[in-house]
């Protein structure tokens, strides 16, 4: 802390406890394609750049600086000096070595390759020069000599990435967990086991290696971490982060009230009134049990349903439109989500910064038009239409009550029967990744 300035005194140490209502799928960066794995992995790994948690603007991480050519196609990154990987048996004498530009190229080449478990290659293959060709030429988990043409090591601290054309959002892609950097030695030693054996450069070190999905995760402070706060204090402040896995939001809230957890990500909607009395009362300090800290920015979360386009029924655009027009999004937001969301009537991307979502022609609630479309498709009042199955996460109460509302709307408006199936997140991801859901 700043000596003599009590306002900026920083307390070091302690254990931070939180819970996830779904288990993680994998902590191997190219395999990370959902939020829970990403939240955990980004405590252990880092990428060239990251997002500022308050402004959501891109900020340098492993890259100390970066520049963009006038054409917008060539990005040059200069790495920070003296950043080290976590100590791990994959290194000589178990001591983590210094990060260099070859590590970054190795990881990005992997991301653009057909290696086992790579679920995120599309982040770069359509953008980086030579990435698609590299992916198509890889097989049997082997990296082609020379790697991706557009990813070049200039020297130990300098890397260049050449794009096919200018992409304004390229830096934000690099903030994703799949673009995090890990050492070649770790992949060569652990292979598929990197799903739970993470070796990175981040503020915390994963201690319980080879954990199962439902076992508590324990991460300890990285004593060699490079970053400091605005006052020069070494980061992170915490000694330990513990993450448990319990899919019952009510039990999670009970543990929070008892002091067994330090944070919950979301309050169950049905518990909002009981916990906060009312949001207005809590903001005014009227609740003696909790103090409310409010962030008025939109959360980076969108909820949407996907059609399985391999199902012949949904290959008819009239049916897809009818489903869309039968859902009263504003009613769901007002009465089920208690106003704590925004109806996606202009596409599912909310207004952010300079982006005005009202320019998108979306779908408003129009059950009459929906019924006419179903008649055109040959399914008046739902007659002859097969029962559809909607697969959702079993651990998120909001998902369940929204799904039940949509189930009722589709039956009331179109006469369509929907069966809701509840799965763990890992099973759910497998089902929609392999087109096993409707």
Model-identified regions with their sequence ranges:
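Short, well-ordered beta-strand elements
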Residues: 12-22, 74-77, 104, 159-160, ...
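N-terminal lobe/hinge region of extracytoplasmic solute-binding protein
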Residues: 19-70, 199
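A structural "hinge/loop" feature
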Residues: 22-38, 62, 89-95, 120, ...
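Gly/Pro-rich hinge or "lid" segments in bacterial periplasmic/extracellular proteins
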Residues: 53, 133-157, 162-236, 240, ...
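Aromatic- and charge-enriched surface segment that lines or borders ligand/interaction sites
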Residues: 64-123, 160, 252-255, 313
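Structural transition elements
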Residues: 204, 314-315, 342-377, 394-402
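Extracellular/periplasmic solute-recognition and catalytic clefts
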Residues: 207-220, 244-310
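Ligand/substrate-recognition segments at binding pockets and active sites
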Residues: 353, 375-438
């Amino acid at each position: 802390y700043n000596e003599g300035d009590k306002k900026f005194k920083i307390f070091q140490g302690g254990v931070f406890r939180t819970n996830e209502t779904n288990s993680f799928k994998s902590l191997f960066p190219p395999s990370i394609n959902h939020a829970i794995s990403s939240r955990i992995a980004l405590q252990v790994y880092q990428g060239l750049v990251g997002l500022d948690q308050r402004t959501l603007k891109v900020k340098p991480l492993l890259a100390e600086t970066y520049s963009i050519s006038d054409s917008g196609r060539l990005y040059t990154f200069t790495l920070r000096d003296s950043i080290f990987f976590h100590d791990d048996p994959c290194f000589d004498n178990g001591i983590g070595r210094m990060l260099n530009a070859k590590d970054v190229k190795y990881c990005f080449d992997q991301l653009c390759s057909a290696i086992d478990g790579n679920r995120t290659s599309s982040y770069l293959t359509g953008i980086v020069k030579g990435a698609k060709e590299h992916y198509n030429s890889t097989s049997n988990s082997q990296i082609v000599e020379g790697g991706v043409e557009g990813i070049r090591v200039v020297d130990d601290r300098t890397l260049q990435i050449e794009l096919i054309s200018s992409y304004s959002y390229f830096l934000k892609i690099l903030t994703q967990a799949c673009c995090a950097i890990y050492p070649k030695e770790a992949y060569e030693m652990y292979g598929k086991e990197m799903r739970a054996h993470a070796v990175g450069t981040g503020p915390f070190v994963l201690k319980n290696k080879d954990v199962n999905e439902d076992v508590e995760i324990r991460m300890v402070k990285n004593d060699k971490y490079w970053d400091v706060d605005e006052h020069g204090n070494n980061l992170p402040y915490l000694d330990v982060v513990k993450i448990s896995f319990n899919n019952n939001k009510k039990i999670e809230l009970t543990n929070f009230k008892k002091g067994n957890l330090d944070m919950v990500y979301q309050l169950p909607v049905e518990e909002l009134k009981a916990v906060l009395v009312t949001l207005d009362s809590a903001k005014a300090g009227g609740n003696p049990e909790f103090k409310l800290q409010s962030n008025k920015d939109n959360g980076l979360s969108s909820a949407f349903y996907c059609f399985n386009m391999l199902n012949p029924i949904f290959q008819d655009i009239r049916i897809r439109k009818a489903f869309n027009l039968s859902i009263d999004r504003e009613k769901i937001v007002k009465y089920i989500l208690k106003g704590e969301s925004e109806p996606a009537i202009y596409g599912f991307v909310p207004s952010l910064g300079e982006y005005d979502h009202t320019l998108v022609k979306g779908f408003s609630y129009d059950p009459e038009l929906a019924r006419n479309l179903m008649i055109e498709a040959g399914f008046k009042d739902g007659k002859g239409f097969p029962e559809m199955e909607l697969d959702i996460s079993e651990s998120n109460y909001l998902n369940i009550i929204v799904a039940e509302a949509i189930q009722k709307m589709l039956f009331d408006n179109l006469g369509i029967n929907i069966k809701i199936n509840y799965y763990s997140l890992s099973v759910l991801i497998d089902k929609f990744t392999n087109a096993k859901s409707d």
